[in-house]
From Swiss-Prot:
InterPro entries: PEP_COase, PEP_COase_bac/pln-type, PEP_COase_Lys_AS, PEPCASE_His_AS, Pyrv/PenolPyrv_kinase-like_dom. L-aspartate binds at R642, Q674, K830, R889, N965. This is Phosphoenolpyruvate carboxylase 2. GO terms for biological process: carbon fixation; leaf development; tricarboxylic acid cycle. It holds the Pfam family PEPcase. Keywords: Carbon dioxide fixation, Cytoplasm, Lyase, Magnesium, Phosphoprotein. Gene3D superfamilies: Phosphoenolpyruvate/pyruvate domain (1.20.1440.90). It comes from Flaveria trinervia. Belongs to the PEPCase type 1 family. Expressed in roots and stems and at low levels in leaves. It is found in: Cytoplasm.
């Protein structure tokens, strides 16, 4: 883009229009949406802060755009000079403005994706453009299985109704956007979608324009920064809000679409309401691994809160159902029940309901039955509320629902009766939707998983054995531990009494088990043991559950994360299955969790991905040998560095036979908003998971050939070696990492309740995977994603040039390898080593500059080798739409990168001299108050010069929005 053209451009959206490819399809509204939102925002910025500040925003954007054109580092310096000349208040406003513009760009993109999707559905075109790499549609999957793969419709239906996808919401601290802003973003999205509807009237348009202006201004006027860290209860409430807003209604709507898709392949049955197609679990308030803020009291609170929320949502729907169920014809079975209830209800207290507040006559039998359901739901909700507030309730247990079977029974009775009286069409309306909600969400809304480190259980058992004076459990061999645990599990005597000496940590573990015993069993899902390495880790949890009187013990799930643990996992699980007591206990079913984050941090992405692939194959073979059905629980993050990527591609690239209709997967942090933030996103997410799980089971991907395996094994060794050589053995690395990235400042964002380190001191090993990825994402260098790939590819090609052809063939024909390469290519497209070079120049000591240069040379070499294997000349050659979307963001992100680098310089070096130009934000009528200065007052206790800390945090949030992930 020539400089003279840039000088003539009046606004940012004019530059955006220059980025439009020569030919854009009619349904491509992205530029239009983007420009509309930005025009509105820049007008708001001018109204609030004056023309001078708006011009500074445009000047920064233009310098960034010039840099993006030629990657001339001088442009970054010019941009840095503009940004460092701003006074503290203006600096905050500029960082906030660019962060806000990136959020608006994301919203424009989401509306555009939904628009393209609708266009495709209208055309009946599912395989258009990028859909092959981003979508997995249930109807298209059914048609593909029946018509292309010659599966019978009955086979498809049978596989579908027996499959389960369990989505596990976790409070991983990667959601950097406050809930207050997420809600405003949702309203902006709605306004934008409605503005581009075909049948909009002029009055509608005017009102929507006003609403859009109002919401954009409200979002900009909201403090983006969390001033205090969230508690686990805050995280749980935030996670559960998605159920209230989209998931609750989204599940029956999705299942109705599945019914329609089945009808279109010739199946005239509906998916049974109790078929477990979709289930939801949570770690919010249950994941205590490294988080001291998750206490037994927190676990109890979140379970009761979820129960109260579930009862409240059912209660709010039951009167609508009563209105619909006005029929008088019913089966004898239902009539007898209705008459009994009518007689007994006259003696009960009358509750002051809004509708049906008087006793329902027996001539409306369905309403009588549902009226009793309403009473019990009311009591269920109130009892949970009392227990939450006061620990006791005077509502007797017999007047509430304590398990889901009690709740389903009267609803099933109504359904059977309607069908028996020829009213199936009515039964299959709202009543079926309600039954499906009850079957999906139960009384607990989600099932809470408990996660704890194996060492904490060892501490408890060591205290017990020392108290019993039989030795130190911690010092026993694995054989001796197993022998003692099995002997105790087979016996009946209590293992310890109230006189057991307890440290605070031991009491915490035991009190957690007591909470499991106290609350209804349907509150809980799995008990996950992190850092599990041997059968005794699993048996220890079984014994502690028994000793604490957990009536229905939770299934125990070992979690294997690091490379060595993944390699040893199949043997460990085989030893576990060899124990007769345990084999009888699990009834032919076992779950194993595999961790993507820590394995990547431990060995690099290539080696971790390959070891995760092999571990799954071997674990499935072990399970088959012992006659056990194994469910894999995938602990995937949102970023590629932590196992993220498009959902259906991730599923379809898993090894054959490793899913077979049963899948658990974590949905973490910002991914929850991206997957469930809107109704259409929720619908699309449920489609992707269900369709891809079905397709993987009925049309498994190919197995790798022996020569591919051998090459992958060799390359993984080299990749791990180079990765560890640099990350763990290179003496300069830790210092370089801490200086070149904002890792040390990450904790100031107050994203999550969990500390960023497992141990307060220590190096890279003790750093959690999220801040590790976060730090490199902020500098757009993405080192954890690509490091090791270059060494592996170079070794393979130099060893034998034929290996290049083999790698190219693997890319074309093997889904696992293709997905692995494509995701790294996407990360390279988001990367920019020029930003890393600027950080080095400003923040890193001169003696480390050569080290930074060698890493950037490695980056370029790896990128070129990757393109050669993919057969691409340029990054994202095969996905021009994604490339366009990323280009639209680059200039905003670059401004924030430069702002961040110079702000870090000023924070870390208080002697760094800058010269402020005059204050440019306009003043209010009274001269003492400047709007930009008001921002400084939001953080009066900062330990740095005024405005620096907030400017830094705003750049972090903006870059996270631009990269569309945090950690």
């Amino acid at each position: 883009m020539a400089n003279r053209n840039l000088e003539k451009l009046a606004s940012i959206d004019a530059q955006l229009r220059l980025l439009v490819p020569g030919k854009v399809s009619e349904d491509d509204k992205l530029i239009e949406y983007d420009a509309l939102l930005l025009d509105k925002f820049l007008d708001i910025l001018q109204d609030l802060h004056g023309e001078g500040l708006k011009e500074t925003v445009q000047e920064c954007y233009e310098l960034s755009a010039e840099y993006e054109g030629k990657h001339d580092p001088k442009k970054l310096e010019e941009l840095g000079n503009v940004l460092t000349s701003l006074d503290p208040g203006d600096s905050i406003v500029i960082a906030k403005a660019f962060s806000h513009m990136l959020n608006l760009a994301n919203l424009a993109e989401e509306v555009q994706i939904a628009y393209r999707r609708r266009i495709k559905l209208k055309k009946g075109d599912f395989a258009d453009e990028a859909s092959a790499t981003t979508e997995s549609d249930i109807e298209e999957t059914f048609k593909k299985l029946v018509h292309k793969l010659k599966k019978s419709p009955e086979e498809v239906f049978d596989a579908l109704k027996n499959q389960t996808v369990d989505l596990v919401f976790t409070a991983h601290p990667t959601q950097s956007v406050r809930r207050s802003l997420l809600q405003k973003h949702g309203r902006i999205r709605d306004c934008l979608a409605q503005l581009y509807a075909k049948d909009i009237t002029p009055d509608d348009k005017q009102e929507l324009d006003e609403a859009l202006h109002r919401e954009i201004q409200a979002a900009f006027r909201t403090d983006e920064i969390r001033r205090t860290p969230p508690t686990p209860q805050d995280e749980m409430r935030a996670g559960m809000s998605y159920f209230h807003e989209t998931i609750w209604k989204g599940v029956p709507k999705f299942l109705r679409r599945v019914d329609t898709a089945l009808k279109n392949i010739g199946i005239n049955e509906r998916v049974p309401y109790n078929a477990p197609l979709i289930q939801f679990s949570s770690w919010m308030g249950g994941d205590r691994d490294g988080n001291p803020r998750v206490t037994p009291e927190v676990t109890r609170d979140v379970c009761l809160l979820a129960r109260m929320m579930a009862a409240n949502m059912y209660f709010s729907q039951i009167e609508d159902l009563m209105f619909e169920m006005s029929m008088w014809r019913c089966s004898d079975e239902l009539r007898v029940r209705a008459e009994e209830l009518h007689r007994s209800s006259s003696k009960r207290d009358v509750k002051h309901y809004i509708e049906f507040w008087k006793q329902v006559p027996p001539t409306e039998p369905y309403r009588v039955i549902l009226g009793d359901v309403r009473d019990k739901l009311y009591n269920t909700r109130e009892r949970a509320r009392h227990l939450l507030a006061h620990d006791v309730s005077d509502i007797p247990e017999e007047s509430v629902y304590t398990n889901v079977e009690q709740f389903l029974e009267p609803l099933e009775l109504c359904y059977r009766s309607l069908c028996a009286c020829g009213d199936r069409v009515i039964a299959d309306g709202s009543l079926l939707d309600f039954l499906r909600q009850v079957s999906t969400f139960g009384l607990s809304l989600v099932r809470l998983d408990i996660r704890q480190e194996s060492d904490r259980h060892t501490d408890v058992l060591d205290a017990i054995t020392q108290h019993l004076e039989i030795g130190s459990y911690r010092e026993w061999s694995e054989e001796k531990r197993q022998e003692w645990l099995l002997s105790e599990l087979s016996g009946k005597r209590p293992l310890f009494g109230p006189d057991l000496p307890k440290t605070e940590e031991i009491a915490d573990v035991l009190d957690t088990f007591h909470v499991l015993a106290e609350l209804p069993a349907d509150c809980f899902g799995a008990y996950i043991i992190s850092m599990a390495t041997s059968p005794s880790d699993v048996l220890a949890v079984e014994l502690l559950q028994r000793e604490c009187h957990v009536k229905q013990p939770l299934r125990v799930v070992p979690l294997f994360e690091k490379l060595a643990d993944l390699e040893a996992a199949p043997a460990a699980v085989a030893r576990l299955f060899s124990i007769e007591w345990y084999k009888n206990r699990i009834d032919g079913k076992q779950e194993v969790m595999i961790g993507y984050s820590d394995s990547g941090k431990d060995a690099g992405r290539l080696s971790a991905a390959w070891q995760l692939y092999k571990a799954q194959e071997e674990l499935i073979n072990v399970a088959k040998k012992f006659g056990v059905k194994l469910t894999m629980f995938h602990g995937r993050g949102g970023t590629v560095g932590r196992g993220g990527g498009p959902t259906h591609l991730a599923i379809l690239s898993q090894p054959p036979e490793t899913i077979h209709g049963s899948l658990r997967v974590t949905v973490q942090g910002e991914v929850i908003e991206q997957s469930f933030g809107e109704e259409h996103l929720c619908f699309r997410t449920l489609q992707r998971f269900c369709a891809a799980t079905l397709e993987h089971g009925m049309n498994p991907p190919i197995s790798p050939r022996p020569e591919w395996r051998a090459l992958m094994d060799e390359m993984a060794v080299y990749a791990t070696e180079q990765y560890r050589e640099i990350v763990f053995k290179e003496p300069r690395f830790v210092e370089y990492f801490r200086l070149a990235t904002p890792e040390l400042e990450y904790g100031r964002m107050n994203i999550g309740s969990r500390p960023s380190k497992r141990k307060p001191s220590g190096g890279i090993e003790s750093l959690r995977a999220i801040p590790w990825i976060f730090a490199w994402t902020q500098t757009r260098f993405h080192l954890p994603v690509w490091l090791g790939f270059g060494a592996a590819f170079k070794y393979a090609i130099e060893k034998d040039i034929k290996n290049l052809h083999m790698l190219q063939e693997m890319y074309k024909t093997w889904p696992f390898f293709r997905v692995t390469i494509d995701l790294v290519e996407m990360v390279f497209a988001k990367g920019d080593p020029g930003i890393a070079a600027l950080n080095d120049k400003l923040l890193v000591s001169e003696d480390l500059w050569s080290f930074g240069e060698s890493l950037r040379a490695n980056y370029e070499e790896t990128k070129n080798l990757l393109l050669k294997i993919a057969g691409h000349k340029d990054l994202l050659e095969g996905d021009p739409y994604l490339r366009q979307r990323l280009r639209l963001r680059d200039s905003y992100i670059t401004t924030l990168n430069v702002c961040q680098a110079y702000t870090l310089k000023r924070i870390r070096d208080p002697n760094y001299h800058v010269t402020f130009r005059p204050h440019i934000s306009k003043e209010y009528s009274e001269p003492s108050s400047k709007p930009a200065d008001e921002y400084i007052k939001l953080n009066p206790k900062s330990e740095y010069a005024p405005g620096l800390e907030d400017t830094l945090i705003l750049t972090m949030k903006g870059i996270a929005a631009g990269m569309q992930n945090t950690g």
